[in-house]
Amino acid sequence: ESWLEVFDMYNISKTARHVKFIFPTAPIRPITLNYGMTMTGWFDAFGLDRSAKEDEQGILESSKYVNDLIQDEVNNGIPSQRVMIGGFSQGGATALHAALTTTHSLAGVLALSTWLPLSSTFPK
């Protein structure tokens, strides 16, 4: 919802009429790093350093959700090469993971202030 507000503030959605924007909001869940407080999160976070445990199941579920959104657009006649995904923080991490695991060729991925989750599962 916060990114939609930014796009609306700068009239991006209105001036780019040939572009369809989809702004999914992460589900509400407890985030361990924030003392279990419930908030929007694509997956649980346990720590900020590279050695912190990762919520593999949550990351894979969120990545699948994004890939399902991509597939919906392809099913609606949009070539995957015209689909770009992106996100900020956990959303960026989800977008990166989805982009690297999708079977589709994408136009690109925009990942801001983020990291690659499950990085050890990818080739160097």
Language model features with spans:
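Short, glycine/serine-rich, charged loops/turns that create anion-binding
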Residues: I28, Q90, L116
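Hydrolases whose catalytic domains are alpha/beta-hydrolase-1, hotdog thioesterase
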Residues: T94-A98, S120
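The feature captures the conserved acid-bearing segment of alpha/beta-hydrolase catalytic domains
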Residues: G108-K124
